UniProtKB/Swiss-Prot annotation:
Belongs to the ALKAL family. One of its GO terms (cellular component) is extracellular space. The keyword Cell membrane applies. This is ALK and LTK ligand 2. It is found in: Secreted; Cell membrane. PANTHER family: ALK AND LTK LIGAND 2, ALK AND LTK LIGAND 2-RELATED. Its main location: secreted.
Amino acid sequence: MRVSGRPMLLALLLLLSTVGDRGRAQSRGPADRQTLLRLLVELVQELKKFHIGDSKRLQLLGESDFALGRREATDYGADQEEQRVEIVPRDLRMKDKFLKHLTGPLYFSPKCSKHFHRLYHNTRDCTIPAYYKRCARLLTRLAVSPMCMER
């Protein structure tokens, strides 16, 4: 938890001024005032050093960690083929089981097999596991379409 130095400094000054002369019968001399002043100045300097240290720590974690270096900046976006994400097909039996679980048994007539294969093997919805629910919906719509209902 971070506490600002000013309220703490004001609290110390208030505390020192209220204690005052209770413990002493005689008034303070100039030497006591100088030591009190020196103590307060040292306290303020320590607080400043503490805050400067905090700001340096925050600065170290700041922009310099996330900035691209000269070499990284030139490599970024250099070759489009290297940045292309290659989707590795998962186990095709698992894909088939999952889609059968979502759709139930589907029948496609021979007239519709070309459309089925295009949809099943070439669309994003049926090749990326995150979109299998969309694929199941598309396959059921294809299966009940008038073109595919004929046997």
